[in-house]
Amino acid sequence: MTTEGSCPFHHTAAIGGLKTNEEWWPNRLNLKILRQNSPLSNPMGAGFNYAKEFCSLDLSALKEDLRRLMTDSQQWWPADFGHYGPLFIRMAWHSAGTYRVHDGRGGAGSGQQRFAPLNSWPDNVLLDKARRLLWPIKQKYGRKISWADLIILAGNVALESMGLKTFGFGGGRVDSWEPDESVYWGVEQKWLEDKRYSGKRDLEQPLAAVQMGLIYVNPEGPNGNPDPVAAAVDIRETFTRMGMNDAETVALIAGGHTFGKAHGAGPASFVGPEPEAAGIAEQGLGWRSSYRSGKGADAIGSGLEVIWTRTPTRWNNDYFQFLFEYEWEPTKSPAGAWQWVAKDAPEIVPDPFDPAKKRKPTMLTTDLSLRFDPVYEKIARAYYEQPDLFADAFARAWFKLTHRDMGPRSRYLGPEVPKEDLLWQDPIPPVDHPLIETDDMNSLKAKILESGLTVRELVFTAWSSASTFRGSDKRGGANGARIRLSPQKDWPANEPTQLARVLAVLEQIQKEFNARSPKKVSMADLIVLGGCAGVEQAARNGGRSVVVPFIPGRSDALEEQTDVESFAFLEPWADGFRNFYKKGCSVPQEALLVDKAQLLTLTAPEMTVLVGGMRVLDANVGRSRHGVFTDRPGALTNDFFVNLLDMDTEWKPVDEREELFEGRDRKTGTLLWTATRVDLIFGSNSELRAISEVYGAADAQDKFVKDFISAWNKVMNLDRFDLAPA
């Protein structure tokens, strides 16, 4: 009972600061990343089809509204040089620029810049204002344009409004409604720390930025040291990690810095907290500055006060002219940040707000890298001497930057999608033949099962092909059958010797079928169909008759459509579904399993049933016996769960590393099973054990088979964007 006037609540779970399960038990497996973007957090409802809405959008009218906004300077946040274009370019760049090739995470694909931590990264200072300036347009067009698309489109229109012919624009980015907690941003506990390095300067994978809270590099130079040559090393490493080569890197840096300015009118001590830490009255904005007016000529952002060209709102070649024709010396901004000034230049650069004032050209340490790194310098001079080459290179690199995480071109929407196939889009030839039908599928499955290929070989090959898919950047998957090509055919996880034999058998079956039928079957389809045949046979071996769903329509990629260097990033460091784990990785096996499951867009129950099924199907890499808790491998049964949960078995690690375990009979000490951490986590982790108990129950066999087939079918079709709305 409470007295009148006193609050009955002292604390509530809705307030941050309470100790979480993860803080109580830091080594606890994080399964939250397998249940992100729940319909419970999505206000649009289950029936909302963004692709349909976007295709009904009057894109021309929207772009015209954006063009008008560019020069409609607002009193609450005035536009530098009377034009918001440079601000919107930076917003779009920083939205897309978090992408990294190692795991495909980051990028502009779901509008994550609106949420923590990205909305409060030091490198994203003042971009809260850019998004808020867009709100009237987002409000006007509502559901027809996502924030994710609008952010990138605003950058495109900004470039066009300042004289650049862009390469194109593809819509189709669907907004998320919560932070993406699957992304590992680094171990640091403070902004701008760099504990991510080891050795001389080896950047931890999969990270693609030099410090916590930066998009790429420190613009002052490594750790604030104004050394252009050393900065070039960081630039090359980080831009490579987001999929850019040297020519694209030079084009992007020079093209982006053709416009606008950096903001460092005063010391950072005048700047208030970032959006996530700001008071409720700030309404989602942050970095309120008490330095003079706090805006316009008094704005403080990065702390750098740099204007690169004479025409900061027009596309031209000033950037390279200034870079090469002037001599540069280091200086400090009013905020105390290292930058460079053209010591032999006249005052020819305009002031952003006072037309009577002029400045000397200024640049960043990372700009000077394009002159003093010998490889970058050669490229930069070519762009300087050939402005048309530069304009085309920047337009193409910008398109790649802003579309890199969208997957194949078939996912792009709208009238401005370029018709040209680009190698980084992982193109696949269109299907140009009649597809097989049910009778053909049954005939082909019979041929496959009569060929001598085992259940394990069929399941293993289909999984190896399909499980390369990454929901992060929509790369990989079974479509294209790139498992036939380098580099995938040589990955140790794919058992190259066995793979070559399986593919040879399937290719002969394909050849014979295609020779006698007007309908054709691709190798991509046949590999998946073989896996389905294997699962059906395994179910029969376990006493169940089932039909595994199969939809034809895949095509076979060509070698010239496959970027070997780029596809190398899809090679698995670990695949817990096949009990594969490369040596030398410090991340626990079970954590890498969850990471893989998240990239496959699986839920915790789907992950669980797939691991249990793959074990009894004997699908471990190298045919290891770890986790094969059954005396009838090749039969689709729930034996994995029954035996894992058997309390007559006692588990102990084989050594102090606790990566391999032996399960012995508690009474006799007889060795029954061996297991990895991935296997035992399903009995150890309380959440996974709860799911395992469902599948280990006496009445669970039918449910197990049904759920395994459902999850299997999901993985086989993850890259079939032609089957489901965007």
Swiss-Prot record:
Family under the similarity heading: Belongs to the peroxidase family. Peroxidase/catalase subfamily.
Tryptophyl-tyrosyl-methioninium (Trp-Tyr) (with M-242) cross-link, chain position(s): W93-Y216
Modification(s) after translation: Formation of the three residue Trp-Tyr-Met cross-link is important for the catalase, but not the peroxidase activity of the enzyme.
Species name: Methylacidiphilum infernorum (isolate V4)
Keywords tagged on the record: Heme, Hydrogen peroxide, Iron, Metal-binding, Oxidoreductase, Peroxidase
Lineage summary: Bacteria, Pseudomonadati, Verrucomicrobiota, Methylacidiphilae, Methylacidiphilales
Swiss-Prot/TrEMBL cofactor(s): heme b
Active-site feature positions: H94
Pfam families documented for this protein: peroxidase
Region (Disordered): 471-490
A single cellular component GO annotation: cytosol
Protein name per its UniProtKB record: Catalase-peroxidase
Cofactor binding: number and manner: Binds 1 heme b (iron(II)-protoporphyrin IX) group per dimer.
CDD domains reported in the protein's UniProt record: catalase_peroxidase_1, catalase_peroxidase_2
